[in-house]
A protein has these predicted regions:
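Glycine-rich, small/polar surface segments that engage phosphate groups of diverse ligands
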Residues: 29-104
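Generic N-terminal amphipathic, Lys/Arg-enriched alpha-helix
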Residues: 1-18
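Short alpha-helices
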Residues: 132, 141-194
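Surface-exposed amphipathic alpha-helices with a cationic face
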Residues: 60, 124-131
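Short beta-strand/turn micro-motifs composed of small residues
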Residues: 71, 109, 139-141
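Gly/Ser/Thr-rich loops at beta-strand to alpha-helix junctions
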Residues: 45-50, 112-114, 145
Length: 194
């Protein structure tokens, strides 16, 4: 069997195994967020950061949700990293944005963060701040053992089909899930061009 056949067979299996109920719960939560006038802050690193930037556009344009990501402000992101450190960059940004109980953060991550291994400490501190401020914590992650999956209010976990492809399939399914959300009849307010 070719690589492409195996890869796409894994993607097909993920579509079947992924919790559709959790995706619908997340759509409900995001609808509630919009109705109460809350803001959505998207956080991620690496490929997930790129996904955050794209998703902000979709949540704003298609769903009418006030959405932001610190990834989109390179000057502030790099200044905070340089001056205060990478581990606090997202929490400091959220603090400066006056994150509050009406708001939510949405984490895009493969592993979701791991305190013991010091993986994505910036996500961990952002989650801790959100919890302290009574903001909702949402996620789309590739591991159910990470900090996001354990601490989040509603977290979509991308099923692991092949350990060699956890990263590419997790990042790909971040896009699949957020596109499902922004086209959800409860959330979508504006039509796409195509």
């Amino acid at each position: 069997m070719s690589h492409a056949t195996q890869f796409f067979a894994s993607a097909e299996m993920i579509c079947k195994k992924l919790s559709h109920e959790t995706v619908d719960r997340l759509a409900d939560e995001l609808t509630d967020l919009r109705e109460r006038g809350g803001r959505l802050f998207l956080l991620g690193v690496g490929g997930s950061a790129g996904n955050c930037s794209h998703a902000v556009n979709d949540f704003r344009k298609l769903c009418g949700i006030e959405a932001y990501s610190p990834i989109d402000n390179v000057s502030e992101l790099t200044a905070r990293t340089n001056d205060e450190g990478w581990d606090t960059v997202f929490a400091a940004w959220l603090d400066g944005s006056r994150l509050n109980r009406n708001d939510a953060i949405l984490i895009f991550s493969v592993g979701g963060g791991d305190a013991e291994r010091n993986v994505s400490p910036n996500l961990l501190k952002a989650i801790d701040l959100a919890k302290k401020r009574s903001a909702k914590v949402f996620g789309i992650v590739g591991k159910d053992t990470g900090y996001t999956a354990k601490q989040g209010d509603v977290v979509v976990v991308v099923p692991q089909i092949n350990p060699a492809w956890v990263t590419p399939l997790s990042e790909a399914f971040q896009a699949v899930v957020w596109h499902c959300l922004v086209s959800h009849p409860k959330l979508q307010k504006n039509a796409t061009k195509w």
